[in-house]
């Protein structure tokens, strides 16, 4: 009987960020402003890089790709979340849930690979400056980007395939503001052990690989910087500082989610942490990279003056 009911399940109910009605309109307005700025800032950064031929180098190719993924990541989650603030109950169909989960999975994993790729690019630029044009060719850069997106696609596809083979009959209420894997596994009436195992193996491997790539790259960068003159040190730190800040902000909440114990309070913490890297990080990244990058600021200023 449970399997029959599970087969007939056509929708989930998202609990959203808050039950308190007095907070819904203020939160809607706040996140609407954040989302609009996120989209405009990331697309604006892409436009600046596209328009200025001086920025057609690997570093900015990766930065433009990161801006695209940030806009995609935010758009996978935020529009539905905004609707939830205005609706009495947040119902999402199983088909919509699958699409949201898949879209979020691709963009989130691709961002991890892009951050690692950008760290490697900085390593080559600072540690092997004379060989940089030889190593970071257009072909290699495009290949690294393609691999990042393929990795994100395959990772999301595998989890999507094994997740929605489960049956959901315990409840159709997802304690989250979007269709995330852990809240979905919690309401499954089928044994999700294989899902947790694959989550540990695949997601864990990706996290370890990308974090190690960043750490090893910047360890070599740090040792190289310390041998340089004060002027060169400042220039190197200005180049790497934005990326290091972005990596710290992205991986901090992500790693914390895996180490704190499971509890009802932890579920609420997970929502706050998810909110940080799905909404806040895509909002902050273009600001961080623009304000700390003189070439981007100069190009943006030139573009704005040209349009006046």
Curated annotation (Swiss-Prot):
What residue ranges lie in the Extracellular compartment?
1-28, 78-98, 155-195, 260-270
Superkingdom, taxonomy of origin: Eukaryota
For this protein, the parts annotated as crossing the membrane are: 29-49, 57-77, 99-119, 134-154, 196-216, 239-259, 271-291
Keywords for the protein's UniProt record, in alphabetical order: Cell membrane, Disulfide bond, G-protein coupled receptor, Membrane, Olfaction, Receptor, Sensory transduction, Transducer, Transmembrane, Transmembrane helix
- Please indicate if the UniProt record lists Transmembrane helix as a keyword: yes
InterPro entries given in the database record: GPCR_Rhodpsn (IPR000276), GPCR_Rhodpsn_7TM (IPR017452), Olfact_rcpt (IPR000725)
- Identify the residue ranges that face the Cytoplasmic compartment according to the record: 50-56, 120-133, 217-238, 292-308
User: Which SUPFAM superfamilies is this protein grouped with?
Assistant: Family A G protein-coupled receptor-like
The record's annotation in Gene3D superfamilies points to: Rhodopsin 7-helix transmembrane proteins
List GO terms (cellular component aspect). plasma membrane
Molecular functions per Gene Ontology: G protein-coupled receptor activity; odorant binding; olfactory receptor activity
Family annotation (PROSITE patterns): G_PROTEIN_RECEP_F1_1, G_PROTEIN_RECEP_F1_2
Task: Please state where this protein is localized.
Answer: Cell membrane
Q: Which cysteines are joined by disulfide bonds?
A: 97-179
Stated role: Odorant receptor.
Family note: Belongs to the G-protein coupled receptor 1 family.
Protein's recorded name: Olfactory receptor 5H8
* Gene responsible for this protein: OR5H8
């Amino acid at each position: 009987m449970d399997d029959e009911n599970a087969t007939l399940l056509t929708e989930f109910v998202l609990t959203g960020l808050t039950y308190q009605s007095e907070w819904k309109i203020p939160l809607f307005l706040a996140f609407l402003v954040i989302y609009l700025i996120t989209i405009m800032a990331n697309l604006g950064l892409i436009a600046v890089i596209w328009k200025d031929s001086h920025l057609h180098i690997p570093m900015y190719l990766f930065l433009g790709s990161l801006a695209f993924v940030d806009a995609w990541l935010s758009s996978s989650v935020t529009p539905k979340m905004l609707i939830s603030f205005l609706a009495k109950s947040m119902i999402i169909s199983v088909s919509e849930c699958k699409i949201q989960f898949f879209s979020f999975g691709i963009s989130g994993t691709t961002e991890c690979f892009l951050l690692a790729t950008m760290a490697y690019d900085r390593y080559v630029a600072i540690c092997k400056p004379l060989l940089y044009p030889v190593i970071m060719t257009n072909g290699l850069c495009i290949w690294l980007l393609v691999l990042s997106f393929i990795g994100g696609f395959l990772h999301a596809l595998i989890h999507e395939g094994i997740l929605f083979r489960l049956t959901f009959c315990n409840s159709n209420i997802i304690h989250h503001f979007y269709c995330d894997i852990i809240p979905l596994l919690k309401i499954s009436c089928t044994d999700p052990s294989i899902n947790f195992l694959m989550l540990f193996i695949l997601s864990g491997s990706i996290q370890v690989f990308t974090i190690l790539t960043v750490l090893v790259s910047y360890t070599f960068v740090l040792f190289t910087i310390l041998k340089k003159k004060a002027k060169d040190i400042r220039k190197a730190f200005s180049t790497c500082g934005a990326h290091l800040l972005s990596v710290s902000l992205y991986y901090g909440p992500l790693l914390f989610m895996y180490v704190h114990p499971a509890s009802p309070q932890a579920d609420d913490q997970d929502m706050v942490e998810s909110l940080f890297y799905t909404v806040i990080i895509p909002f902050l990244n273009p600001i961080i990279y623009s304000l700390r990058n003189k070439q981007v600021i100069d190009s943006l200023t030139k573009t704005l003056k040209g349009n006046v």
